[in-house]
């Protein structure tokens, strides 16, 4: 599996992992800030998302394996791993599998154990593939902050890819993960949108931070923080520079 990716800069590596239903374009507003700060920035499209090829299983457990393969392909030793939404599931699995590859893990508006905000994607999971061409316009209306990121899912083929990706999401893949992740000793941080309606601060972010023993920073904005408030996210991320 060769993941489509953006790769720029020559400093310490930062790996940016998007979630559902976005793509590596989620990070376009943040990448220039990291480059100016002197980092190498690698932002892939997860398998089956954006411009990356699909597979029978594009769940987050499989994604973690492909992300590790990407680190090997690019000869990246240890990275600062920053992930959003269900991409944080892939990031947690990667960190537990190969803690020696992760310098720091930053979880942004992400999953906590089996809390993956599945109610928000349930309608997509049950969408009739025969009507797939109608899916992207519906999502563009519902998810206005990221409507420009949904271009990869235009038309029947794009809609079918998105339905398949939704059906591969399995919250059981991070059940019991929190204690294991904390035991790795990897430095952990959480950054969260103050108005996240999908994975709220009080019911997800704060319990996750407490369980991980990790600092939590609240940034003004909703669930799709890297798009809604890139300046605020960049400031939060770079306040403690990845070494």
Locations of the language-model features?
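Conserved loop-alpha-helix segment in the C-terminal half of the alpha/beta-hydrolase fold
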Residues: 184-221, 227
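Conserved catalytic-core motifs of eukaryotic protein kinase domains, centered on the activation segment
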Residues: 26-28, 52-58, 116-119, 201-202
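Active-site loop/oxyanion-hole signature of alpha/beta-hydrolase fold enzymes
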Residues: 36, 43-82, 235
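The conserved beta1-alpha1 loop
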Residues: 17-19, 84, 192
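Alpha/beta-hydrolase fold catalytic core
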Residues: 1-14, 36-39, 72, 76-77, ...
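Conserved HGGG/HGGXW glycine-rich cap/lid loop of the alpha/beta-hydrolase fold
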Residues: 6-51
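Conserved alpha/beta-hydrolase catalytic His-Asp/Glu region
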Residues: 116, 133-186
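Conserved hydrolase catalytic core segment
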Residues: 77-119
